[in-house]
């Protein structure tokens, strides 16, 4: 009797494994779509991220009362580091964004399927889903984010990603790979939550206000809604981004958030919390809008609802 029941048990396990595999396939597709969309947007808009980092870390003592604008800094980088200098830090950016955006979209898709079960999210649900998905991706990719920020700042002479990892672990310990993680989550989780809320709500209003939208115009509508949502979300989370940058570049000086807020205000004043806001708003808005547009188009081609 025992021998007869074993094949049935194995057969039941095989069916369970197959069902589990089928359930995972859409998540893998969402991960791949997110990774591809993140790669495209990262390569295009990397110069804006570099300029944002440089603007946030300019020393006031070196420039006196004279403000350095984005255009002046752009010309300085091109003159001293060549045009390719604008793409400095591209390697860690790609290493971070390819899996990072994929993890975000994969997690978001899974949460939507589990909690929403097909119905569109409310404004509050969008905030929670976006913030939760971004938190998962942020924790997973924190070490690469630290390396990327230091690459872009121009203060560190890392020869490779591996050399950077080894140097940070040697000088700061394993904890150094998670410098500024709290500030990163305080910046990214609200950004993603606010962005997803504005994006989904704006898109619903636009789509419901038109009887029949031409399929060719759908990507344009998605991109436009993404631009609007990105601008609002970027402005709200700008101070947290400045704090995160300082904590990752100077972890000895900026040890915790409260201390960082005090030091930034002392050195730069209230304006210091909004340094680099223009390139960041441009980049985050364009990156998010393009990533969502490409992601939704690819998911539609695969027959999946994003």
UniProtKB/Swiss-Prot annotation:
SUPFAM superfamilies reported for this sequence: Mitochondrial carrier (SSF103506)
Keyword terms of this UniProt record: Membrane, Mitochondrion, Mitochondrion inner membrane, Repeat, Transmembrane, Transmembrane helix, Transport
The reaction(s) this protein catalyses: glycine(in) = glycine(out)
UniProt main location, coarse: mitochondrion
GO molecular function: glycine transmembrane transporter activity
Alphabetical list of InterPro entries matching this protein: Hem25/SLC25A38 (IPR030847), Mitochondrial_sb/sol_carrier (IPR018108), Mt_carrier_dom_sf (IPR023395)
Subcellular location: Mitochondrion inner membrane
Domain of life of the organism encoding this protein: Eukaryota
Any GO CC annotation of this UniProt entry: mitochondrial inner membrane
Solcar repeats: 25-114, 121-205, 217-301
Protein topology in the membrane: Multi-pass membrane protein
A Gene Ontology biological process term: glycine import into mitochondrion
TM stretches of this protein: 31-56, 89-115, 127-152, 180-203, 221-247, 276-294
Entry function: Mitochondrial glycine transporter that imports glycine into the mitochondrial matrix. Plays an important role in providing glycine for the first enzymatic step in heme biosynthesis, the condensation of glycine with succinyl-CoA to produce 5-aminolevulinate (ALA) in the mitochondrial matrix. Required during erythropoiesis. Plays a role as pro-apoptotic protein that induces caspase-dependent apoptosis.
Family: Belongs to the mitochondrial carrier (TC 2.A.29) family. SLC25A38 subfamily.
Name of the protein in question: Mitochondrial glycine transporter
Organism: Ovis aries (Sheep)
């Amino acid at each position: 009797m025992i021998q007869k029941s074993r094949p049935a048990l194995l057969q039941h396990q095989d069916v369970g494994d197959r069902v589990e595999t089928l359930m995972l396939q859409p998540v893998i597709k969402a991960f791949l779509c997110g990774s591809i969309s993140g790669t495209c947007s990262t390569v295009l808009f990397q110069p804006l991220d570099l300029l944002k980092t440089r603007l946030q870390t300019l020393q006031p003592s070196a420039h006196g009362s004279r403000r350095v604008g984005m255009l002046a800094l752009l010309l300085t980088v091109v003159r001293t580091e060549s045009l390719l200098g604008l793409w400095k830090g591209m390697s860690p950016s790609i290493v971070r964004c390819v899996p990072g955006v994929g993890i975000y979209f994969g997690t978001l898709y899974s949460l939507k399927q589990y909690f929403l079960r097909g119905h569109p999210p409310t404004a509050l649900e969008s905030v929670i889903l976006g913030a939760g998905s971004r938190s998962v991706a942020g924790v997973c990719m924190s070490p690469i984010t630290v390396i990327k920020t230091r690459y872009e700042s121009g203060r560190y002479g890392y020869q490779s990603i591996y050399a950077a990892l080894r140097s940070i672990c040697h000088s700061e310990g394993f904890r150094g790979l998670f410098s500024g993680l709290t500030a990163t989550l305080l910046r990214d989780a609200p950004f993603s939550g606010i962005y997803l809320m504005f994006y989904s709500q704006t898109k619903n209003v636009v789509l419901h206000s038109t009887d029949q939208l031409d399929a060719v115009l759908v990507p344009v509508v998605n991109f436009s809604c993404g631009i609007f949502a990105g601008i609002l979300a970027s402005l709200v989370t700008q101070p947290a981004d400045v704090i995160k940058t300082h904590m990752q570049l100077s972890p000895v000086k900026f040890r915790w958030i409260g201390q960082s807020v005090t030091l930034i205000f002392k050195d730069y004043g209230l304006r210091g919390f909004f340094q680099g806001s223009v390139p960041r708003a441009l980049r985050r808005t364009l990156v998010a809008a393009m990533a969502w547009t490409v992601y939704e188009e690819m998911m539609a081609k695969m027959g999946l609802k994003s």
